[in-house]
Amino acid sequence: MHYEWDERKNRENIRKHGVAFQDAQEVFDDPFHLSLLDERFDYLEERWITIGLTKGKQIIVVGHLYYLKENGDEIIRMITARKGTEKERKHYENIG
């Protein structure tokens, strides 16, 4: 699995949410992470929300896309990442 993002969006995300995409990708290594299809809006693409724990033990919520490259590599394209709320932290603890 590979990760990608727009660097300008990453800088904006750090400024707005205090979370770098480089750190947020760690949630996908969490064996208890949870990914759900984001059906809140009528996006023109299939968007996902993943919640998980980073190596620094921080609950992070990531908005992202999944897609396959022509060579078959699976790509996760980061859209946004933020620290989880208290409610999201409790939800995560109940699934882990």
Specify the residue positions occupied by each region the protein language model found.
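Ribonuclease/tRNase effector modules and their secretory precursors
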Residues: 1-96
